[in-house]
Structure formats: C-alpha cells, structure tokens
C-alpha cells in the first residue's frame, strides 16, 4: 500500500473518530447521481458505513464503502462475495442490497466497492441491549422471542438454501416444483468496474418499511391444532446427502446482536453483514485446512459469539451450520442478560478467556435466573438457550427445531 492510500485510509479513520461533525456536507457522485454524506454509522477493517442521502429524491441509504488496496486481490474477491451473498438469499428478514458499484480508487491502483443498503433508523438489537443496560430495563420475554423468531427464519433461509432453480420465495411458500421452475432466477450479472447492477429493487424505488420486511406467518396465527410439545433429540448428526438433496446449506458465521437490524416497526429483525457467509458443510481432511478455517473464523466471527469448534478446528470432522446455532444461543442470552454468556463480568473476575470458556461450555445464568422457578424469564426460555449452547455440535438442534421451540415458547406466553 503506497503513502497516498494510507493517507486516504487515515481520512476515513479521522471521520470515524469525529463522527457526524465532519464531512456532513460532502457530496459523493456515483454513476451520475449525487449523494450527500450525513454521518458515519460504523466501521470495521477496510470498510466504513455512512448515512447517505440522494440529493434528488431525499431518500436515505446506508452506504457501505469497502476499500480494496492494490496488491490485495483477495479483498476484492471477498467484497464481491459479500455482494453475491446479498443477492443469493432473498427473505423478508434478510437485508437487501439495493445497488452496488465498483470504482477505481483515485489515490492508487486499488478498488473501492460501494454497497447501497436500506437505512433502518432504529439501529440494531445491540443498540437496544446497550440502552437496556444503561436504563436498567430489559426485553419482555414475548417481544424478545418474537424478534429472535424472525432472526431464525432468516437463518433458515440460509441453512435450507436450494442449490439452484426455485427462488427463495418459492421455497418459503411451499410452491410446487412446476411453479418454482417457472420462477427460476436467472442469476446476477457480473459487476463491472464503474457501473452498478441493481438486483430486483434499485435506488429509484422501494422502501425499507416494515410492510416490505415483515416476518413470515406469525406463530400466534397458526392453526391451533399445532402439537403442543416439541421433542428435540439429543443428537443432531450431519444429514446424509440423500436427506439434503436439492439443498445447498450456507452458514452466516457471524450472527450477533450488532448484525441484527430492527425495521421501522421496531419489531421486525433484519439479518445483515454477509461478509463471513460460507457454504455450511466444510470437511476438514488435514491440518492445513483446519488452520485455514480457524484463521477465517478468527478474522470474521466475533469471539464472544463464536462456536467452540471454530476456536480449535479438528481434523477428520465436518464443520456445519451448527456454528450458527451456537451463535444464536449466545445472541438470545445477550438479548436477555446484556452480554454473551462467555464475556460476563463474573468470568472476567475469574480470569478466564472467552475461548476456554466456550470450548468448555462454561457459562451460567445470572443469580436468580438459573432455578426452575423464578427469575425474569421462563424455564422454557432458559432451556432453549441451553439446547443451543451444547459444546458438541451434533447435540445442537437444527434451525427448524429452534424455530419450533421458539414458537412453542411464544404460544405458552399467550
């Protein structure tokens, strides 16, 4: 990376520190359209997310700017994979990429990739958790489980992703194969430098309203004849190929409260940030592949929400979508109690590391919350967390089983 590229990156870092008090009147011109940069929303690595406004329509966007310095070709590939992931998973609880653009950096030979995403004014679940901690409040169990349920529906769209052919919508609604065939996706066109390629909705239309991003059918509206108890087997083996025929499971690999936006209705969750997404089933034949996967997890998966099998990847195993189930368990715990179960103050006092605690499954509920009776949340709620936080990935429930348990818990709160 040359000096000019370093200076350019330093500018973004400066804006990150000073926030909205700088560059509020800056105007960015892309493909003949002008966008006013209002403030910095977040940053990470070589990427920055800004609140941008179309000067013509006044519409607000979350503009993600990804720097890909010269000599780092892998960073371009990784950024493009993130764009493809947004287009691959079409679901009401998964964020849409409204438009994307690849441009040549004016400072060096690198590339800059812009992603136009919907702007959600209510922020993320992490913002709510932080506010609860500051104000001494907490999520009501029913509201929390409802948000968690919508998040699980998004994860199911990844874990049960069809190989090719039927659209995600067809799979969700149970459309017949004949109807699905008629609605095949043609696949996204290639991104060209200096030009955009909108998916189904562009910057000119649509909105990020709750109507557009509502959950699938609310479990409270389902048939009252639904069975009352959900039995979860102790073992969840990796399904044989015949059992997943037609499916291509993907794993998000970085599920956490900060990656769950809240739509304008303040109750519809929107799963975001697919830069870490990978095909779920990854065989580990040797130590080289094990170390590669371990390094990828260290780079892309937040430690407090990382599954134990990703801290020390073993040879002769297959990594699966069960890593997301663990992250969901940590996320639900954090929604209820303020932090991941493996980064609590109690653990810090004992000097334990997050990695060792996760690999040993060492966590506890806050005082008064672990008993069968009492506490702010039900025993059924705590049992849901316990099931997801099994150290052995084969013992964790599938995403469908998690959804079933969550719906059962919601029904019992009626």
Residue ranges and their predicted role:
Residues 48-68:
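Glycine-rich ATP phosphate-binding loop
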Residues 38-45, 49:
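Protein kinase glycine-rich loop
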Residues 108-124:
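Conserved short submotifs of the Hanks-type protein kinase catalytic core
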Residues 96-113:
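Short beta-strand micro-motifs within the conserved protein kinase catalytic domain, predominantly
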Residues 1-30, 38:
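Juxta-kinase regulatory segment immediately upstream of eukaryotic protein kinase catalytic domains
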Residues 65-89:
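Conserved N-lobe beta3->alphaC-helix segment of eukaryotic protein kinase catalytic domains
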Residues 191-239, 246, 258-303:
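Activation segment/activation loop of eukaryotic-type protein kinase catalytic domains
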């Amino acid at each position: 990376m040359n000096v000019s590229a370093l200076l350019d990156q330093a500018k973004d870092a400066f804006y990150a520190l000073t926030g909205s008090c700088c560059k509020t009147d800056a105007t960015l011109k892309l493909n003949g359209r002008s966008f006013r940069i209002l403030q910095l929303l977040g940053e990470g690595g070589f990427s920055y997310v800004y609140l941008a406004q179309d000067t013509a329509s006044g519409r607000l966007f979350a503009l993600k700017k990804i720097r890909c310095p010269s000599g780092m070709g892998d960073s371009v590939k990784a950024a493009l994979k993130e764009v493809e992931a947004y287009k691959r998973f079409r679901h009401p609880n998964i964020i849409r990429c409204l438009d994307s653009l690849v441009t040549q950096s004016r400072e060096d030979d690198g590339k800059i990739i812009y992603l136009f995403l919907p702007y959600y004014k209510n922020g993320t679940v992490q913002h709510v958790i932080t506010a609860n901690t500051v104000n001494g409040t907490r999520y009501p169990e029913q509201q929390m489980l409802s948000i968690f349920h919508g998040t699980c529906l998004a994860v199911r769209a990844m874990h049960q992703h069809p190989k090719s052919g039927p659209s995600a919508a067809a799979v969700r609604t149970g459309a017949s194969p004949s109807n699905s065939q008629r609605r095949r996706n043609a696949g996204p066109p290639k991104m060209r430098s200096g030009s955009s390629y909108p998916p189904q909705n562009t910057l000119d239309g649509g909105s990020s309203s709750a109507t557009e991003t509502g959950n699938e059918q609310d479990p409270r509206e389902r048939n009252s004849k639904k069975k009352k108890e959900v039995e979860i087997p102790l073992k969840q083996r990796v399904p044989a190929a015949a059992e997943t025929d037609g499916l291509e499971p993907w794993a998000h690999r970085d599920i956490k409260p900060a990656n769950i936006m809240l739509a304008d209705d303040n109750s519809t969750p929107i799963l975001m940030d697919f830069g870490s997404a990978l095909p779920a089933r990854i065989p580990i034949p040797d130590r080289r592949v094990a170390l590669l996967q371990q390094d990828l997890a260290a780079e892309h998966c937040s430690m407090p929400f990382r599954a134990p099998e990703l801290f020390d990847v073993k040879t002769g195993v297959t990594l699966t979508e069960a890593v997301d189930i663990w992250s969901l368990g940590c996320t639900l715990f954090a929604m209820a109690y303020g932090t991941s179960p493996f980064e609590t103050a109690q653990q810090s006092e004992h000097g334990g590391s997050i990695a060792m605690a996760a690999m040993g499954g060492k966590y506890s509920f806050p005082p008064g919350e672990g008993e069968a009776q009492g506490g702010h949340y039900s025993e059924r709620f705590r049992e849901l967390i316990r099931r997801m936080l099994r150290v052995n990935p084969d013992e964790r429930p599938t995403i469908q089983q998690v959804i079933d348990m969550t719906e059962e818990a919601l029904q019992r709160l009626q």
